Amino acid sequence: MKFARIRSVALAALLATSAPAAMAEATFSTRGLTVETALKAAQAALEACRKAGYQVGVAVSDRSGVMQVYLRDRFAGPHTVDAAANKAWTAASFRISTTELASETQPGKPMSAIRQIPRVAALGGGLPIEAAGSTLAGIGV
């Protein structure tokens, strides 16, 4: 009985000292936009489009493509909800502007089948938001 207890204490001590190192190797950290920053980005895009005479919807997704913010101008059509969300998702997912993706996925090009993936928006209006070499989010208009 005493030996079993000593063995249990030794095993617990071993796990306690090796767990932080093992955990550090088994996890990773990511960076992303706060919802406040995502909202500011969406507001800036909406204002720029208004100044250019466009009524739009603007979506900002996190780096995984999950929508954080959506703004729709008063006269923006109902299609703008899905269009903006899919452009933000595409830009974040592929880490490329949707205009560039549209060019790279034209019929006959090696990556043309990407257009068959649900939610891919291969048309202009989506950009990845990047900082320090990392994609933080996607924005779509």
Language-model regions, residue ranges each:
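Bacterial N-terminal signal peptides
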Residues: 9-19
